[in-house]
From Swiss-Prot:
Note: Present with 861 molecules/cell in log phase SD medium.
Name this polypeptide is given: Protein MNE1
Coiled-coil features, chain-numbered ranges: none
InterPro entries: MNE1
One of the GO biological process terms: Group I intron splicing
Pfam families for this protein: MNE1
Cellular component annotations (GO), alphabetically ordered: cytoplasm; mitochondrial matrix; mitochondrion; ribonucleoprotein complex
Length: 663
């Protein structure tokens, strides 16, 4: 099983590389260890896994020495393929162990046809290994680890050494061009450090080696995107898509490749422009990219089109349709011809007139929620606005489904833009005063909205406030009683509010219920390795990592416990492969088996308000015994949490009573 959250011990990325990758050819500043130094713990064993891989790469006449590689012929493509598989299977320890082994020997490298590769100084690794290593370092940088500065330093040293070997290579001077994917990887490693100092350093290396202004501009764009400097990003964007007629054929081809490699930054820039209603500017960038024969992949294209529909940027959709062989469906139930300043009430009027049915028709009308942004942070103003829109809907259609659509749009907007108290107050107004509890329940049936309906919005809104642990517990218990279909995002919201050791029992309660209901969705088939694997989603792994890193006591104990749980659950799925034969669906792990994995005496499998308060008091006492106090303790408001939780319980009690009255 591949873990997506880091282990808080001595296995940080920077230390892993320093311990394993002590190869002067790659990192000359670390120096070569004495010959008596045993680099690998298993290098005395002739049957170690690295020995096996190297034997696969040997020519028939060579033999592998158990301690060192001396004067052997290895096939480059076989070793590279092994490294690529280790990278893809997320095994950095063995990856660097193998790279270290080949870097400390005297090897003659052979190409696929068996001829020696001699276009680089003797006893130096071929440049292909630099390209491959940059891919691995970039993959490591995607983790939520505290090693991004270390990776940035490594990438600078790697690039500097790469250019040095380039000048010393036997390739004819002037014809050698650096691998642009390697340059992109090094750039993004630097960018992820968010250090302007390292950015300037890599740009100087590019300038000294005549890599061209476009690469420097794209690296600057990537830096602005990573650091969310949107104004600066917009200023430099046009220079990243220059006049396509100014280049020769080779330079043009290289520029197109660079643009494609940096396409995530370009896509993010376009998304910012669309969100800011910079429609004309976005269209100009799209037209400039088309002159370079640049094409977005289907995923990015779909996301840009949907975002444009959400923000009613119809010119962008038309431009993308003109540049693409496929055409997006842009009809918005009569809204496509409306000016952007049309009010929400006018939009609802058109939807009602066109008999829009959100429970049957899929739509891209989320952009209407942006028309709520102008309302001030005043509860009475919002209540008045809700009344006006609802009165209009009652007069024109009185359809519960259209009112459900309006409520869902309203709460999705509130969950990300207002505090939880404000959001909960409006929900209470909708249920108690407006008597719209039926449309509220219907939001779960809106087409294409299964994972973003009202109650999921409540989970997300509550997770934005640190004083909502008991509130989220109450919300979960109330919905669990009626058999509600939770998503992994609901449990992510519960994990996010865990901020310190006092939250331990609540954390394991949420983690357990996540695995009860969602773990079968994390069991996937890896096409590359041709095997099944089980892994936690990245966001879940990040939330777990954040909680583990915030613990004041028992850090190692909890880290080991979480790792053991995920290991055991993953092993259960991989070993049992619990498929239902009739449909090919995956059977969730047995609850009794999962409880055994968590530990019956260690975990609270049932938790209500009283149990929560007792468990928190117990953990608080353990903290006081250690004389520990954190900023998170001061931020958490228990009284507010109790109040929110009671209001949530009252809401559900009221809705249940209304349902009983109608039976």
């Amino acid at each position: 099983m591949k873990l997506l959250f880091k282990r808080y011990s001595s296995s940080h990325i920077g230390k892993l590389i320093k311990d394993s990758l002590i190869t002067p050819e790659i990192l000359p500043q670390l120096g070569r260890q004495p010959s008596s130094h045993k680099r690998l713990p298993n290098n005395k064993r002739t049957n170690s896994i690295t020995d096996k891989w190297l034997k696969d790469a040997l020519t028939r006449k060579d033999k592998l020495n158990e301690d060192k590689l001396q004067n052997v012929n290895l096939r480059l493509n076989v070793v590279l393929t092994t490294l690529q598989k280790l990278r893809t299977s997320d095994n950095p320890a063995l990856y660097f162990a193998l790279l270290n082994r080949i870097g400390t020997g005297h090897i003659k490298w052979l190409n696929k046809s068996g001829r020696q590769i001699d276009a680089f100084p003797p006893d130096r690794l071929p440049l292909e290994f630099y390209h491959e290593l940059s891919n691995m370092l970039y993959k490591l940088s995607l983790r939520s680890a505290n090693d991004k500065i270390a990776l940035a330093k490594f990438s600078l040293q790697l690039l500097d050494r790469y250019y040095f070997l380039k000048t010393k290579s036997l390739t004819i001077e002037g014809k050698f061009r650096a691998n642009i994917k390697f340059l992109r990887n090094c750039t993004l490693l630097i960018v992820k450090s968010q250090s302007n100092y390292y950015l300037r350093a890599i740009q100087r290396l590019f300038a000294e080696n005549s890599e061209g202004q476009l690469l420097a501009n794209l690296s600057q764009l990537a830096f602005y995107v990573e650091t969310s400097q949107w104004t600066s990003m917009l200023d430099i964007l046009s220079s990243c898509v220059p006049d396509s007629g100014l280049r020769g054929s080779k330079e043009r081809e290289r520029a197109i490749q660079l643009l494609e490699l940096f396409s995530p930054c370009l896509v993010k820039s376009l998304k910012v422009m669309i969100a800011q209603n910079m429609e004309n500017e976005a269209c100009q960038i799209l037209r400039s990219l088309s002159e370079w024969n640049f094409h977005f992949d289907q995923h990015d294209s779909s996301n840009l089109i949907q975002l444009s529909q959400n923000h009613s940027c119809l010119k962008v959709i038309e431009t993308m349709n003109g540049l693409s062989s496929t055409t997006a469906v842009t009809r918005q139930f009569g809204l496509e011809k409306l000016p952007t300043d049309v009010s929400l009430k006018q939009s609802i009027h058109i939807l009602s007139k066109d008999n829009f049915e959100p429970l049957k028709q899929d739509s891209f009308l989320q952009f209407l929620s942006f028309k709520l942004s102008d309302l001030p942070l005043n509860l009475e103003v919002w209540k008045k606005h809700i009344k006006e829109v609802d009165d209009q809907m009652q007069a024109e259609s009185n359809l519960h489904s259209l009112r459900a659509f309006f409520i869902d749009m309203l709460l999705c907007h509130l969950s990300v833009r207002k505090d939880f108290d404000f959001m909960l107050s409006l929900v209470e107004h909708i249920v108690y005063e407006k008597n719209l509890w039926q449309p509220l329940l219907l939001t779960d049936n809106i087409v294409g909205n299964k994972e973003n309906s009202t109650f999921h919005c409540l989970f997300h809104g509550a997770s934005q406030d640190i004083s909502t642990k008991l509130t989220l517990l109450a919300l979960y218990n109330q919905l669990n009683e009626i058999g509600y279909q939770f998503t992994s995002h609901d449990f992510l919201s519960m994990l996010k509010v865990c901020k310190n050791y006092s939250d331990s029992d609540f954390f394991y309660f949420a983690f357990y219920n996540l695995l009860v209901t969602q773990s079968h969705k994390f069991f996937l088939f890896d096409k590359f390795s041709d095997k099944f694997s089980w892994r936690l989603p990245i966001q879940i792994g990040d939330a777990i990592s954040e909680w583990l890193s915030s613990l004041e006591i028992d850090i190692q104990e909890n880290t080991d416990r979480v790792l053991q749980i995920t290991d055991d659950v993953g092993e259960w799925y991989v070993e049992n492969k619990p498929f239902k034969s009739e449909k090919g669906t995956i059977q969730p792990i047995n609850i009794m088996e999962l409880r055994k994995i968590f530990g019956e005496r260690k975990t609270l499998f049932h938790m209500d308000s009283e149990i929560f308060q007792k468990s928190k008091a117990k953990r608080d006492k353990e903290m006081r015994n250690e004389a520990l106090f954190t900023a998170n303790d001061a931020e958490y408001n228990f009284a507010a949490d109790v109040s929110y939780a009671k209001r949530v319980e009252n809401l559900f009690s009221y809705i249940r009573s209304k349902q009983m009255q109608q039976k």
